[in-house]
Design a protein with these regions (language model features):
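Charged docking surfaces used in two-component/phosphorelay signaling
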Residues: 34-42
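Short hydrophobic/Thr-rich beta-strand motif most characteristic of the beta2 strand and flanking loop
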Residues: 44-51, 59
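The feature encodes the CheY-like receiver
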Residues: 33, 74-75
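Alpha4 helix (beta4-alpha4-beta5 surface) of REC/receiver domains from two-component response regulators
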Residues: 37, 81, 102-119, 125-129, ...
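A short, hydrophobic beta-strand element within the central beta-sheet of small alpha/beta folds
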Residues: 93-104
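Non-catalytic signal-transmission and effector/linker regions of two-component phosphorelay proteins
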Residues: 1-24, 28, 125-147
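Active-site residues of response regulator receiver
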Residues: 71
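Acidic catalytic/metal-coordinating carboxylates
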Residues: 52-55, 78-81
Length: 147
């Protein structure tokens, strides 16, 4: 029998300081890409965009990003299916995944294995804070001042 402790995903050590971490972002809308790029570049992150979940799955294995952000409604492999596949694959299961959508889908995102869910429209401070918190959970949260 497998204990709950044995099922926990291993935490990948951060090789890149969080401010220069590579973020793989799955978004097809060019206007939203521009907004996300501005928010994340402004915070000091390196961002790589892809159009669909299948591309993201392939690049996640090749690039080993620090975090993956995905919209639910993307072509091919949707964001929830992408999340499930990432979390089921040993070499990618430790990568934090943030799912975002205009849909009220937080429960479905969590069930798919998402580490966080953000409702669109995205707010810069919330997006950046969630990314920072997932990259280094021991840092004090800017929102609360607490770890």
């Amino acid at each position: 029998m497998v204990s709950p402790r044995d099922r926990v995903s291993p935490v990948r050590p951060s090789i890149v300081p969080p401010a220069r971490a590579l973020i793989l972002c799955v978004e097809q809308d060019p206007h939203i890409r521009e907004l996300e790029s501005y928010f994340l570049d402004h915070a000091g992150f390196v961002v790589q965009f892809v159009d669909d979940g299948a591309q993201a799955l392939e690049l996640a294995r090749a690039l080993e990003p620090s975090i993956i952000l995905t919209e639910i409604l993307v072509p091919g492999l949707d964001g929830l299916a992408l999340c499930r596949q990432l979390k089921a694959t040993p070499e990618t299961r430790g990568i934090p995944v943030v799912v975002f959508s205009m849909l009220a889908a937080e429960t479905r995102a969590r069930e798919a294995g998402a580490d966080a869910f953000l409702k669109k429209p995205l707010a810069e401070h919330r997006l950046v804070q969630v990314v920072r918190d997932l990259l280094n959970p021991s840092w004090p949260s800017a929102a609360t001042g607490m770890p």
